[in-house]
């Protein structure tokens, strides 16, 4: 079985997020942004967000006012990995989940589920590569 990996470019999407820009300033968040670097980027650029609660395993839930998806702008519509998870740990979590035997037959762009360091993780793949990693919204206890 071929090992599924995540690219550096995909980690930018997953961790910091993808934005639209006006005059070289980010104005709307399109997708991704599940790492601490997303919160740092939002703060740096004066974009409003709220972390409403933190699960026992460190997964944070909240909202991002500049997100294009309405559900991400609402209470607990967005999830971030634990604060101590850097891009390297997020990548390892995504690769771990994508390479679980139970996920080997999952089609492209469908959710693959697994657990890594007490966090339930969702990963997506496309053409043999990971194209998205995020914490599962409902962290099981």
Where are these regions (language model features)?
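N-terminal "domain-start" segment
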Residues: 1-111
